[in-house]
Amino acid sequence: MRYITAGESHGEALIAVIEGLPANLLIDEDFINKELKRRQGGHGRGKRMAIEEDKVHVLSGVSNGKTIGSPLAIQIINKDYENWKGKIVPAMTRPRPGHADLSGAIKYNQRDIRNVLERSSARETAARVAVGSVAKLLLKELNIFVKSKVLEIGGISVEEEWPKIIEEAKSKGDTLGGVIEIIIEGVPIGLGSHVQWDRKLDALLAYHVMSVQAIKGVEFGLGFEAARRPGSLVHDEIYYDKERGFYRKSNNAGGIEGGISNGSPIIIKAAMKPIPTLLKPLNSIDINSKKQVKAAYERSDVTAVEAAACVLEAVCAWVIADECLKKFGGDSIEELKKNYDAYLEYVKNF
């Protein structure tokens, strides 16, 4: 499978096109809309979330609620577009440190940085959550589930303290990042491959996780902690039971060994940096005058860690769904499930 997204933060709509879905997959729009709603929630979100009411509109690829094998096109309307339509907006010339502003303006020869930030904005992730929700619907047919939890915000792991530290950051004109854990359950042994570098499952997942705006680090299982331990305290010993088959009593590998899923839950942690739009802006340079200025301020969140967790679920669900289709094949959901069940029987009897 593959997908692309299109649209700007304050454009008329966001669009996503998914190619390669099997036919007869039930597209539950209520589920997709609930996932979009999740993305809009969480502590520290900005005023934009009070404007938008993200809902998916299927444009093609579905008949009677099910996919038909052709590309699935979906649209999410930007309600805030009405507030910008026809409005003359002054050029933005003061890049924000930590954003794509300066690099993007230089790369694409843009004297108005808004032409960069409109696409680099995390608003684009609404389209990816919709895409990932479709992937989740496919995975549900195979009893594979993706979930997440926020481990830290602003270095604090106690959830009850998050509202307080977020308000403190807001009062100081600052922003906060955090750490998110993604758990993928029900993944069989055998997704990914050791035979080529670009087929390794952990590499594919890391690539997609790192593609999410503001994500600056990723680890699997023990991650960096594995570098501090001897091998005897890192590697997961192998056991066998006639009913369970091969299994492990620990999961330090995070469900992947040699680039291949090993049957344990896949455990990923991602580090999200603080949002680079600060109410009290950092120093910058005006790209026209070349004079020292304060960076521009755009309406933004204090933190979006909880929202990012939903986005990370989506991109990870996409990878696992894509790998399932690569391995098991099937032009219809019925064929995919038949092939998948046969493979599970093979693994059980190995």
UniProtKB/Swiss-Prot annotation:
Superkingdom, natural source: Bacteria
Residues that hold FMN according to the record: R119, S120, S121, Q213, A214, G258, K273, P274, I275, P276, T277, R299
Positions of NADP(+) binding: R39, R45
Family annotation (Pfam families): Chorismate_synt
Cofactor note: Reduced FMN (FMNH(2)).
Pathway as given in its UniProt record: Metabolic intermediate biosynthesis; chorismate biosynthesis; chorismate from D-erythrose 4-phosphate and phosphoenolpyruvate: step 7/7
Family: Belongs to the chorismate synthase family.
Protein name according to UniProt: Chorismate synthase
Organism encoding this protein: Thermoanaerobacter sp. (strain X514)
